[in-house]
């Protein structure tokens, strides 16, 4: 696989080329064919995704409802789409190692049930696992089926808060794949041209870095609500909303912190 800088191509075209190697058409076709006939395990095998969970054990430990929700998600999981969108690192575009990424959360009944998460894991950097991905369940400490006293074999077994694919189902769930275009801001982006001049009113994005700034407030609201830190509708740039701060990563050494404010009820309804 060529490095991202070997041929002098742009960053965008380089990442597209990386994915052509990492998720070839043959993988997409095989995984899709298996998924469409209900063979989610076969789809995972075609996309080189290992399954480290047992639905019968899930039903016994967390209840039938949790197992049914998990089964429905697995039936609609597009493992090739998941592989396409997982975080990668330069210069060779390999999967970022040692990650545990949440895909979905379930809440079994019972006072001590806790939360159960479907997660995707990438192998540690030292493991001879190639570019394989694994699916597993993570139950928080103190919950039924939670981690035991022994160290977990994965270096970072807890879901990583930096990569919330449970809030971005369009990156792995075939039922939500159509949401990619509006969630990425493409619906209001001029075809083949630069972003609209009014999309960055605060002037926070460096020149030449095309970002869908007009989506930041809405995406921040989704994240803040999921973490229980939102109290209203996000939509402003001014300071003053306690707990409404969000950091946006613009590059390896560049971040901007935004603080959102709720839109007044009268304005939000107009």
List where the protein language model places each region.
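C-terminal structured domains
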Residues: 232, 236, 249-270
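N-terminal membrane-targeting/anchoring modules of bacterial envelope and secretion proteins
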Residues: 1-220, 224-225, 234, 238
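DNA-recognition helix of helix-turn-helix
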Residues: 244
């Amino acid at each position: 696989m060529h490095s991202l800088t070997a041929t002098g191509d742009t960053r965008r075209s380089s990442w597209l080329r990386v994915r052509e190697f990492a998720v070839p058409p043959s993988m997409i076709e095989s995984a899709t064919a298996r998924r469409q006939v209900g063979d989610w395990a076969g789809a995972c095998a075609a996309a080189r995704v290992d399954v480290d969970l047992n639905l019968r054990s899930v039903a016994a430990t967390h209840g039938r409802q949790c197992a049914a929700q998990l089964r429905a998600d697995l039936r609609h999981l597009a493992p090739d789409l998941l592989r396409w969108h997982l975080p990668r690192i330069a210069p060779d575009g390999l999967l970022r190692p040692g990650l545990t990424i949440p895909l979905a959360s379930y809440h079994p009944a019972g006072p001590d049930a806790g939360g159960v998460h479907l997660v995707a894991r990438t192998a540690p950097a030292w493991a001879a696992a190639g570019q394989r991905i694994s699916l597993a369940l993570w139950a928080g400490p103190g919950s039924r089926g939670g981690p035991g006293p022994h160290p977990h074999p994965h270096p970072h077994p807890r879901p990583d808060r930096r990569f919330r694919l449970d809030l971005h189902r369009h990156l792995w769930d075939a039922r939500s794949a159509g949401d990619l275009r509006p969630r990425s801001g493409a619906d209001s982006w001029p075809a083949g041209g630069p972003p609209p001049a009014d999309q960055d009113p605060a002037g926070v994005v460096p020149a030449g870095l095309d970002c869908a700034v007009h989506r930041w407030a809405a995406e921040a609201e989704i994240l803040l609500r999921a973490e229980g830190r939102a109290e209203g509708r996000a939509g402003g740039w001014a300071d003053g909303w306690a707990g409404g701060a969000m950091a946006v990563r613009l590059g390896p050494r560049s971040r901007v912190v935004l603080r959102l404010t709720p839109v007044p009820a009268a304005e939000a309804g107009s």
